Each structure stands twice: as C-alpha cells, then as structure tokens.
C-alpha cells in the first residue's frame, strides 16, 4: 500500500489553521487516533465532504488532498459556474458511503482528526479524488499526488476546466469576511437543532441560513475547539444537504 509522508500532531500558526479550513484552536481534543501510527484500521464509512469522512466512530481527514468546500463554486471554460464543492462531496459519497474502507493512520492533525490514506477495495480514494479533478494535491504537506494533479490539469478535468480558487484560499477569504461582521470577530455559528448542538463554519453551505439570536442557547464561537469543548459537533455537510430542516431548526 502506497502512503504519503507520515505526519504527526501539527501545532503551528493562525495562518496554518486557516489553510486547514479551521479557526485557531486552544488544544487538540475530540477525535483520538484509533490505532498506532502507521497501522491500518477499517470500518463502515459516512461522508462529511470531499476530503473528510467518518470510518466507524473515527473522523478522518484524507491525507495529501484538499477538496473544494461544499459551498464553493468553480467556473467552467465558458465562465459559467458549477457546484464543484457539492460535486466533490457527491463523488466521495458514490465511492464510499456505507461501504467498508481500510485506512492507514498517519497521525493526528491540529484538531485531533486522524490523517489517513484510505482504500475501498484496491482504490486509493485520496488519489482518486485528485484524478477526478475534484481535489487539489495538498503539496504544502504532501507531494504524494502531484503527478495525478498534473494529469488532471493537462486534461482540464474537474476544477481544472476553468477558474477555481484553491480550497485553502476560499476558506481564508470566507473566514475573514465573516469575522468582520461577527460579534468580537468570532464567526462560527453554534446552532441548536432537533439533532443536537451543531456548529457551522463560515464556508458551510447552510451558514447564511442559520440565525444566532440567543434563542435556545444558540451562540457564536471563535474556534472549533471552543465549540467542541462546549458540547457542539460539526455539521455533517452531506446530511445537511439532504436533511437541511433538522440541521437548521
């Protein structure tokens, strides 16, 4: 099984946190590594978005790739927009939702999520997303999929058919814009729904529909770690698309 370079716990700066698509944390917590570093584990899969899945009870950030955020759009060659973020989530769901995958544990990221390379059968799903043009090779942290990205770019596949803002830039820009209008510059929305306490990042597809008015304990957070420590969980992006009423009420 081919794997990208091993990464352990990442503790760096605010800029690093924004690139990963999250706010600055206090500490890493929440998602412990299920097995020792560089060993395999398996389980049934639930899709969060184009580069994040749950395998059993473990939240996985797919190593070496960065997919468009679910609310993100890209442009075709003719300049028209398409929902590249939704398409990336859909492609991931088609590959793995409800299926057993085998993942190689590369350690934890800053937020305690397990970094992993995952396979369904013999298919490397990290690699496949880059081949489909539905994820960037995350070369700041791994060069495992540079060749696949070059091939997708050459054939103008997926995000390479027209203009597409890299996901890390999209997150940073969206965070900055939301923080300018959020109370005390803390733009994470902590909603209370029939499904429990759920927080939405500024790039969540339902972010603009959530109203934080103090009703039923709804509140703002400055960091994901703060939200998690208070008992909120991240919104499941795909489920939010298919079951939006429960996520938003």
Q: What is each of the regions a protein language model found here?
A:
Residues 2-12:
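Bacterial N-terminal signal peptides that target proteins for export
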Residues 12-22:
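Bacterial N-terminal signal peptides
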Residues 20-31:
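Bacterial Sec-dependent signal peptides at the C-terminal "C-region" and cleavage site
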Residues 27-28, 135-143, 154-249:
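Mature, structured domains enriched in cysteine- and short glycine motifs
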Residues 29-138:
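Electropositive
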Residues 62, 129, 152, 199-200:
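Bulky hydrophobic/aromatic "packing anchor" residues in well-ordered structure
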Residues 86, 90, 94, 127, ...:
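Solvent-exposed, polar/charged alpha-helical surfaces in well-ordered, non-transmembrane soluble domains
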């Amino acid at each position: 099984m081919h794997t990208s370079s091993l990464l352990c716990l990442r503790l760096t700066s605010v800029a690093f946190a924004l690139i990963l698509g999250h706010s600055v944390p206090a500490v890493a917590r929440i998602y412990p590594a299920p097995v020792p570093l560089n060993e395999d584990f398996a389980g049934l899969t639930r899709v969060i978005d184009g580069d994040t899945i749950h395998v059993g009870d473990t939240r996985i950030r797919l190593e070496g790739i960065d997919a468009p955020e679910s609310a993100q759009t890209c442009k075709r060659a003719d300049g028209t927009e398409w929902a590249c973020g939704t398409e990336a989530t859909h492609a991931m769901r088609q590959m793995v939702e409800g299926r057993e995958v085998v993942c190689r544990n590369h350690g934890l990221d800053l937020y305690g999520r397990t970094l992993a390379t995952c396979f369904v059968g013999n298919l490397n799903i990290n690699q496949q997303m880059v081949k489909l043009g539905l994820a960037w090779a995350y070369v700041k942290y791994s060069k495992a999929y540079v060749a696949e990205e070059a091939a997708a770019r050459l054939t103008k596949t997926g995000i390479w058919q027209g203009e597409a803002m890299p996901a890390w830039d999209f997150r940073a820009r969206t965070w900055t814009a939301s923080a300018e209008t959020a109370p005390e510059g803390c733009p994470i929305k902590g909603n209370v729904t029939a499904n429990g306490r759920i927080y939405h990042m500024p790039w969540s597809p339902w972010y603009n529909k959530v109203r934080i008015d103090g009703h039923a304990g709804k509140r703002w957070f400055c960091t994901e770690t703060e939200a998690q420590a208070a008992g909120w969980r991240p919104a499941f992006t795909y489920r939010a698309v298919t079951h939006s009423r429960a996520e938003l009420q």
